[in-house]
């Protein structure tokens, strides 16, 4: 399953041809692949950035932003719907916190970005946790998502190619340091 989901990028269980028809039907009846529904896609005039607007199963919406810079393909992913902080430079805080994203909803953004790029013959090189929300206020799910992104048999994003951007939540930074992950940390 992992190979089909992460490496081959299938979006339907029926495409997993090495599984029996009965198993594929059971999977289809009980699970979904990529719960994000793309409801918008906006490219900049220079075409070096594209913003994806996703609808979640509960109807809430989140954004991810894909950026091209030289050989780098960086995806900025959301960790919350809204945000409890009210940073002056960020519109998301005006929404307030609606809810935290699950690790699966965070990783789904990465899988979508990988599929989007692979259709163009490109690969995702970097992930930054700096979309909607304060990642350190959704610590457990963000940490789980980072570990899933980094699995060799998963999304296979190198740990040093993952950056967490925070508004400076000190207790979260301290807790993150205890995890001994070698991700990047950006404070904005």
Pin down the residues of each PLM region.
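Extended basic-aromatic, gly/pro-enriched interface segments that bind polyanionic ligands
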Residues: 188
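Flexible, acidic/Gly-rich N-terminal and inter-domain linker regions that tether
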Residues: 2-73
